[in-house]
Amino acid sequence: MSTSTVDIPPQFDVVDRPLDTQMTISMGPQHPSTHGVLRLELVLDGEMVVKSTPDIGYLHTGMEKLFEYRKYQQGIVITDRMDYLNPLGNNLAYVMAVEKLLRIEIPERAQVIRVLMCELQRIASHLVWLGTHALDIGAMTVFFYCFREREKILNLIEAASGGRLTPSYFRIGGLMMDLPSGFERRVKQFQDGFPKAVAEFHKLVTGNRIFQKRTQGVGYISAEDAIDWGLSGPSLRGSGVELDLRRMNPYTGYENYDFEIVTEADGDVWARYLVRMREMEESHKIVEQALCRLAPGPVKADAPKVVLPDREAMKTHMDALIHHFLIVAEGFDVPAGEVYQPIEASKGELGVYIKSTGGPKPARVHFRGPSFVNLSALPHMSRGAMVADIVAIIGSLDIVLGEIDR
């Protein structure tokens, strides 16, 4: 019986290769904590992260290009689908940018309602962050508590706009419609019960020693590095930088509200957690003040060539019917110019840049998304961390890939 030998190529001769202490693996997009839309390329030395590189684009939809083929008012529905956990914030930044180009003034009641709805949306966004962040680390129970409270807010948003996740409630020149009858009473009911819910969250998570061990001293970034990386929102304030656009560059009447800019100095996952927890309490305070400031009045600007008329006016005035037809069929011309409008969204600075060459459609729309910028600092935060800590660091940034990929 003959035998044969097979020559093994040198590159596969593992006996003669020195052992390499590093290896490269993919985390996601199938990993539960990356939710199917984010991949990280991790270079590991044992359990320690040497380098992490985010790989994005799994949720790319070409939103910014879509704006160029749609009239200004049609772009509102696109903004809903960026950060789909904070759609009203997206609506607000976009409509305010267009209103700047048009130079139209918004009625006081519409301004107050915008603040009211945005702060409710901020709480809802933070509730999703808290539930999923804790769930990824291993604290399962609080997830259900958070979504119980979020459901109450989504019911309020649905009552006002007809939509839950994609409300498109803010319109260029004001609001889609006024608040429905009994809305203020329903908000007060939510307000009365929310402090008790926050106390439950603290009992379940803040006092959890395992959660503390998983977050304290993890994902550290100094104030100087946070500024250099361009972080904003809770991710920046968690490093002790007191920057909030609602106070530093107030818009839609925020200068009239009393609230604290929440900061924590430690710069780790735990600090960013505490900032968002306290921010929910501050948003609760702002909602209370907005309810007190609500006064009767119009919710649409006096700009008949831009703002759709009421249904009753269309039935009784021919000019209102004509304006409605022209706005829907042809849109409205926006003066040529450029504008950048930033707001303090739930995840940080959300900025909208619009370039108009005149006409009913924008020449260019670009968004400065907080999640995109905050994610860029992940390699810095995760260097030297353990593999298990990556999940906690990602959660502390509160990123949404719909806004990152656009």
Language-model features and meaning:
Residues 1-406:
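Metal/cofactor-centered catalytic core regions of large enzymes
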